[in-house]
Swiss-Prot record:
GO terms under cellular component: cytosol; small ribosomal subunit
Signal peptide: none
Protein name: Small ribosomal subunit protein uS13
Source lineage: Bacteria, Bacillati, Actinomycetota, Actinomycetes, Propionibacteriales
Database matches in PROSITE patterns: RIBOSOMAL_S13_1, RIBOSOMAL_S13_2
A biological-process GO annotation: translation
Entry keywords, A to Z: Ribonucleoprotein, Ribosomal protein, RNA-binding, rRNA-binding, tRNA-binding
Database matches in InterPro entries: Rbsml_uS13_C, Ribosomal_uS13, Ribosomal_uS13-like_H2TH, Ribosomal_uS13_bac-type, Ribosomal_uS13_CS
Record family assignment: Belongs to the universal ribosomal protein uS13 family.
Job description of the protein: Located at the top of the head of the 30S subunit, it contacts several helices of the 16S rRNA. In the 70S ribosome it contacts the 23S rRNA (bridge B1a) and protein L5 of the 50S subunit (bridge B1b), connecting the 2 subunits; these bridges are implicated in subunit movement. Contacts the tRNAs in the A and P-sites.
Coiled coil: none
Disulfide cross-links: none
Name of encoding gene: rpsM
Superkingdom of this protein's organism: Bacteria
Compositionally biased spans, kind Basic residues: 101-124
Amino acid sequence: MARLVGVDLPRDKRIEIALTYIYGIGRTRAQQVLEATGVNPDLRVHQLGDEELVKLRDEIEANFKIEGDLRREVQADIRRKIEIGSYQGRRHRQGLPVRGQRTKTNARTRKGPKRTVAGKKKAK
């Protein structure tokens, strides 16, 4: 199994797809990296040589924030929004959708499991 920037890449997948296992690299960035390094995107990970892996690693580390650095930056951005008291920061603190989605129905992923509320009791 090839290891790139701290992530094990699956051996039997095409390198174009395998690069997307790295946090911060999607299909478009994977294609950009392969084009910049001149590596054939149709090769499988186990077919890559050491020099190709070194080229890929150097290109990724030089040009992109990935994995831990990117996760820290995203968390810092969220913390900053919470501290300055922006609308988005308040939504993050309350655990509600941040980008204007409806919350009367849906939003279950963000709000968590449904809490049942008891109805009114009938008077005798």
